[in-house]
Amino acid sequence: MPTSAKALTKRLIEIPEMRRIQHLHFIGIGGSGMCGIAEVMNNQGYQVSGSDITESLVTKRLAQIGIDIAIGHDSKNIANADVIVVSSAIDRSNPEVKAALEARLPVVRRADMLGELMRYRHGIAIAGAHGKTTTTSLLTTMMAEGNLDPTYVIGGKLNASGKNAALGSSRFLIAEADESDASFLSLHPMAAIVTNIDQDHMETYGNSFDKLKAAYIQFLQNMPFYGLAVVCGDDPELYAMIDDIGRPVLTFGLEPFNDVQAVDLVTEGTKTHFTVLRRDHEPLRLTLNIPGVHNVYNALAAITMATDEGVDDAAITRALQKFEGVGRRFEQHASVEIDDGNVLLIDDYGHHPKEVDATIKAARQSFPERRLVMMFQPHRYSRTRDCFDDFVEVLSSVDELLLLDVYSAGESPIAGADTKALARSIRLRGAVEPTIVDKDNIAPVMQRLLKAGDMLITQGAGNVGQIAIDLAANNLYIK
């Protein structure tokens, strides 16, 4: 049988209802949520193409696996496509979207495409304000170690494989659920995790925390009545919502009332040792190779779900031993030599005050002897405005602070919510003297501030991570 015929047969067996669709085109394919779905569909035998405004490591990798990539948006890019998949950043003014609408092609959101993938599998969706990517990655690793071979779509790259998506051979699909634009309401999983809830992306919910909480309840009620909700019992807002979920619930946390509890936490460098207590199971002593109490919570969420899905303790133990973390989540790059010592480079994606605080605490815990120098890039003017006081408090706890301009993510500037305002308020607090840097003066500032024995953390969801890559590659900015 020809390869194309095999691919078609594979598609018809797995999703016969999608037999009319052969060619999918992704607009904004380089995005973290888009590239994973595109890769899964490509591996499933569909013809996949995509476009993005700029070339990146992601688009290069997708091209290497056979996906037709166009840089720039042009109506000709959608030729022969049967369906167009768009990220939340793409609107109807995009030339490819315009051409698709004129051709009466279906234009679907990324979450709707993920929802269709999930419809025909045992879907497990991971939602929450913080920790989604790490929790999804941990659960994927546990289920793979338990020989369940899941399909997965993750918002970051697994360091062990260098991938953020893969097509598995089993009925399981594990995926992140995005609350930022309420698109997680398009998913109908069999089981779901909510790591925590926080006031972020409030513009999506009319600046109403009650509407945000209602959306999470609706997300969990999208499961069948026999599904399972795994939620953090230590989060007071989540715990208060349990009675409204109307589905079976298991809680996890450090408090003794939880169904799954971690006790006896011991820190050893970047490792954390802890014991898991579960009903009807023997206590299980585990070692997590990534630092921070916040990651113990992420591990507990994954352990709770993995245990319910039948993963045994030996597989859970092996998974945690093998887990190498996720790209841009407290990712340690090679140290760079400076004077008579070195500077340790750490890169982290966290962009909310609670995430930044968790990074700082994990760094202090892991490397107490090193001075903490943070280069922070605020992400979105709206978040800077909404979390301004919390950012001031958290960022004041580092030893040296470098501030980049706000990464707008398409937003217009907001008065009093820019880097200068942030620096001014931090300076008035008096704990640390912030330095504003841009691409033209990074090198002299770094050369002046960094000392042997420091750790430099590049922090934020924008393009600040490239600085850590450049430093690790060639000591750029230091020498």
From Swiss-Prot:
It holds the Pfam family Mur_ligase_C. GO terms for biological process: cell division; cell wall organization; peptidoglycan biosynthetic process; regulation of cell shape. Pathway: Cell wall biogenesis; peptidoglycan biosynthesis. InterPro entries: Mur-like_cat_sf, Mur_ligase_C, Mur_ligase_C_dom_sf, Mur_ligase_cen, Mur_ligase_N, MurCDEF_pg_biosynth, UDP-N-AcMur_Ala_ligase_MurC. Its EC number is 6.3.2.8. Gene3D superfamilies: Mur ligase, C-terminal domain, Mur-like, catalytic domain, NAD(P)-binding Rossmann-like Domain. It is an enzyme of class 6 (ligase). ATP binds at G128, A129, H130, G131, K132, T133, T134. GO terms for cellular component: cytoplasm. Its main location: cytoplasm. GO terms for molecular function: ATP binding; UDP-N-acetylmuramate-L-alanine ligase activity. It catalyses: UDP-N-acetyl-alpha-D-muramate + L-alanine + ATP = UDP-N-acetyl-alpha-D-muramoyl-L-alanine + ADP + phosphate + H(+). It is found in: Cytoplasm. Keywords: ATP-binding, Cell cycle, Cell division, Cell shape, Cell wall biogenesis/degradation, Cytoplasm, Ligase, Nucleotide-binding, Peptidoglycan synthesis. Disulfide bonds: none annotated. HAMAP family: MurC. Cell wall formation. Belongs to the MurCDEF family. This is UDP-N-acetylmuramate--L-alanine ligase. It comes from Psychrobacter cryohalolentis (strain ATCC BAA-1226 / DSM 17306 / VKM B-2378 / K5).
